[in-house]
């Protein structure tokens, strides 16, 4: 039986770990040939091995020359680019009053400038070939005040604005553009950040979240694959939240004194 992405070519940035790796694996399992992009080749090559196909390419998405080289490498292998997933991202925990411009610029360069640069180059290819799909990894932090992540939150809010504008401008070219906003997700970065005791709580009794657990990377990947598929052919310009219900819960009564 044919798979949804048989014969399709997909670029995933930030594919060396976590959500990006899960996205690459899911597309590969659905038949796609996946270009795994990131700054360091070793983890990308591990992702390719887990996918069982595809190839790795080292690039810094915030650097225009690297973005151009990435597109050139893709077109050396493929005749067309069907899907781009802008997943690469970094954060910075410097408190707002202590943050310098270097902290700010580094996060904005990767998280917002990078998707603009890469999307523009890939978008031109897609417009010429008659269509395609561009997807952005945003965050629930785009709509909240999670701290101390001022630069990260601002970059993800910018992604949602870029997402809507791209959807409107690129629709006449047959290009759909959507975003996915993950909630707290179980990745190796999360485990390192919180430690084993807190991780056990987050995985099984996270009472701030209605489903009482973290999101799985595979659940995020499923959202990306759906939005890239023909099953979502009428969907563009949306932001799909995958957070186990976190942003639906105002959590007001639970914080009040019991007496």
Language-model region placement:
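Conserved glycine-rich Rossmann-like NAD(P)H-binding loop of the short-chain dehydrogenase/reductase
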Residues: 30-45
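Substrate-binding pocket helix/loop in short-chain dehydrogenase/reductase
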Residues: 95-96, 103-108, 205
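Active-site helix of classical SDR
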Residues: 119, 155, 163
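Alpha-helical segment proximal to the catalytic Tyr-Lys
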Residues: 124, 168-172, 233
């Amino acid at each position: 039986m044919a798979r949804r992405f048989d014969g399709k070519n997909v670029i995933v940035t930030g594919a060396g770990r976590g959500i990006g790796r899960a996205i690459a694996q899911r597309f590969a399992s659905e038949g796609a040939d996946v270009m795994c992009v990131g700054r360091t080749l070793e983890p990308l090559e591990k992702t390719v091995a887990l996918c069982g196909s595809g190839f790795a390419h080292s690039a810094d998405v915030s650097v225009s020359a690297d973005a151009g080289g990435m597109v050139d490498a893709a077109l050396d292998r493929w005749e067309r680019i069907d899907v781009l997933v802008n997943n690469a991202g970094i954060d910075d925990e410097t408190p707002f009053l202590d943050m310098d411009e270097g902290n700010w610029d580094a996060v904005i360069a990767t998280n917002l400038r990078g998707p603009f640069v890469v999307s523009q180059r890939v978008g031109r290819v897609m417009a010429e070939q008659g269509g395609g799909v561009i997807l952005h990894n945003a965050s629930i932090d785009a709509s909240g005040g999670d701290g101390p992540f001022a630069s990260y939150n601002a970059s993800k809010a910018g992604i949602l604005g870029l997402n809507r504008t791209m959807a409107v401008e690129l629709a006449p070219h047959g290009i759909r553009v959507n975003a996915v906003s993950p909630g707290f997700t179980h990745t190796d970065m999360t485990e390192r950040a919180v430690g084993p005791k807190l991780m056990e709580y987050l995985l099984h009794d996270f009472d701030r979240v209605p489903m009482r657990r973290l999101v799985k990377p595979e659940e995020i990947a499923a959202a990306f694959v759906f939005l890239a598929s023909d099953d979502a052919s009428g969907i563009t310009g949306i932001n799909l939240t995958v957070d186990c219900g976190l942003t639906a819960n105002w959590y007001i009564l639970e914080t009040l004194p019991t007496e």
